[in-house]
């Protein structure tokens, strides 16, 4: 093992990276509330793991979606647990995100020179809410269907572009298979990818600028 480690160390300088990560200065005013962002990240990782597991059984069609969720909950080993953890961590992620935003705002963490960190955080907050909206519809039960119908119908009040925007969101004039396909694609591919990119940017900026000082 020593030779293998030395081979990688010679090329990647792993020890220098580890020293940089473990020796970062932590201000004395930091308390447990500064962990809310990290908890949000942890919830996101749980979401990715449990969501990936559920894709093996979920079928994104209007005729099979609900039945596939029922099958996952009743017939798949620990399927009920996987879906329950996914739902619980989703709620926890939203709660931790909201608390994190309040903590950053109340402690002035959005001020110069951390404006871009704040902007990426706001984008991540929007993405988090979007996860909830798109994921809520995937079981395609009565609650999910009508939630999608209401949410996608909101932009119709916008002058000129309202109706085309609604049709873009739904994939057609009415809510149906195209809508479910769009929401499934957003929930399982587009939103996770965007979230991962903005989280990386967010943490790199925090790493570069450090934790903001006390008010």
From Swiss-Prot:
Membrane topology according to the record: Multi-pass membrane protein
Annotated binding of heme c, by residue: 35
Record text on cofactor binding: Binds 2 heme b groups non-covalently with two histidine residues as axial ligands.
Keyword hit for Transmembrane: yes
Pfam families: Cytochrome_B
Classification via InterPro entries: Cyt_b/b6_N, Cyt_B6_PetB, Cytb/b6-like_sf, Cytochrome_b_N_euk/bac, Di-haem_cyt_TM
Protein keywords: Chloroplast, Electron transport, Heme, Iron, Membrane, Metal-binding, Photosynthesis, Plastid, Thylakoid, Transmembrane, Transmembrane helix, Transport
Disulfide bonding pattern of the chain: none
SUPFAM superfamilies recorded: Transmembrane di-heme cytochromes
GO biological process: photosynthesis; respiratory electron transport chain
Chain's role: Component of the cytochrome b6-f complex, which mediates electron transfer between photosystem II (PSII) and photosystem I (PSI), cyclic electron flow around PSI, and state transitions.
Protein name: Cytochrome b6
Source species: Klebsormidium bilatum
Name of the coding gene: petB
